[in-house]
């Protein structure tokens, strides 16, 4: 036979679980009902055709500090643009959206991945021969075009669209 203390413990625990579940369910309902849903396409009669093939995006996060005010640089402790000159890619995501638009796959490319960087023309007009280096060097040396060419050549995946968020954009988003 169970002791009265055990029965009391089980009763209190059961009531607490039921009460917690009820409050959670009610809270979820309040949050769900407070979300404003908008049909952004209502009233638009002429729209472009839906894409009929898969699409690939390269999303790059850059550490460029261009565009930050002196006050923002001081507040965020980023150093000056002279100290952190140039642009390096901190984050690279290759996003594939399926033909039917029912699936998306995202691959994060580590910035220190060793890759064959194709030949490029530097800012002084000198042609540099292909070389092995960290993949984010492609972005620092030749910007988006060289990074795209590097990723396409190493992955054999065509990149259809390019999105870059620099440090200034990141700060303003957050």
Label each residue range with its predicted role.
Residues 1-173:
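Non-catalytic, solvent-exposed segments at the cell envelope interface
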